[in-house]
Amino acid sequence: MTDITSLLPHRDPFLFVDRIEKADAEEVIAYRRFTAAEPFFKGHFPQYPVVPGVILVETLAQCGGAGLRMSAGGTGMFFLAAIEKAKFRRQVRPGDEVRCVVKNLRVSKSMLRQAGKAYVGDELAAEAEWLCLIGDAPTA
C-alpha cells in the first residue's frame, strides 16, 4: 500500500485521501472515509453533521493530485487555481466512505485540469472540475 503522505504535502487534519485503488494517465480511483472525529463536524453541524461541500471538492482534488503523482511522479506542488461546475447531490455523513473517480483532462508541466465525481456506494454525492497550477512551494 502506498504511503499517501509521500504523494501529497497535506497532513492531518487536512489530508483527505485514505487509499488509492487505481492511478494511471487517464483516471484515478481513491477513497476517503469520513469519521465522526473530523474537526469540521463540531461546527458543520453539531446536531446533524454533514461533510461541507468545499471539503468534498478538496477531497476530489487531493485524490486527483495523489493519483497523478503516483502514476507520473514529479516534485512540484499543486495549487488550486479554479473550481468549476461544482454540484452537490447527496449529503455525506460521518461513517460514509467516499469513492473518488477523477479524470485527467489536461496535464502539462505547469498545469493540471481534472474532473471528478464523489460517490457514496453507487450514489453520486458531488462532482466538479478544477484547474491546478504546478510549481515549487515558496520558501519561507
For each predicted feature, which ranges?
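Short Pro/Gly-enriched beta-strand edge/turn motifs at strand-loop
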Residues: 1-4, 96-100
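Compact, glycine-rich, soluble single-domain proteins
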Residues: 41-68, 80
